[in-house]
Regions:
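Non-heme di-metal
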Residues: 1-139
Length: 139
C-alpha cells in the first residue's frame, strides 16, 4: 500500500472514530442499565483512544524520515515489574470470570482480563523496542 493511500485510509478511519465517539456518548446519556452504560462508555473511550492512535500514525507517516528514537527513561527491571503486575491482574480476572455464572459480571471481568492482556503486550513492546533495542526504524 502506498503512503498516500494509507494516509487517506487513516484519515477516513479517524473521521469514523470521531463519529463513533459522538454516537456512544449519546447512547450513554440515553441508556439506563448500568452495565450497558459501562459498555458504551468503554466503547466511547476506545474510539477516543483509536483517534489518538490514528493521529499519531498520521503524524508518523507524514514525516517520511527516519525517526530518531528519543530514549525511554525506564529500566528493564521496572518494565518487567510493570509487566508482572499486569500478568497478575490478568490471572486474577481470568480466574474470577471462570467462576462467575452471572453473564453481566462475567462480561465485566472478561473485559478487565482482556485489557490487562493488552497492557502486558504493550509493555513488552516498549521493553523490546525502546529499552532493549536501540536502533532507528524507518517510517
Amino acid at each position: 500500500m502506498r503512503n498516500h493511500q494509507l494516509m487517506e485510509m487513516l484519515k477516513d478511519q479517524l473521521d469514523h472514530e470521531e463519529h463513533e465517539t459522538e454516537v456512544y456518548a449519546r447512547k450513554i446519556r440515553e441508556t439506563k442499565h448500568s452495565v450497558a452504560k459501562l459498555v458504551f462508555a468503554k466503547l466511547m473511550r476506545d474510539s477516543m483512544q483509536h483517534a489518538d492512535v490514528l493521529n499519531c500514525a498520521i503524524s508518523y507517516l507524514a514525516t517520511s524520515q527516519y525517526e530518531v528514537l528519543a530514549p525511554v527513561n525506564e529500566t528493564r527491571e521496572e518494565m518487567l515489574r510493570l509487566m508482572d503486575m499486569e500478568e497478575k491482574a490478568l490471572r486474577l480476572f481470568s480466574a474470577a470470570s471462570n467462576q462467575i455464572r452471572d453473564p453481566h459480571l462475567k462480561l465485566l471481568l472478561t473485559m478487565l482480563a482482556f485489557d490487562e492482556e493488552q497492557h502486558y503486550a504493550l509493555l513488552r513492546y516498549v521493553l523490546e523496542n525502546f529499552i532493549e533495542k536501540k536502533e532507528v526504524i524507518k517510517a
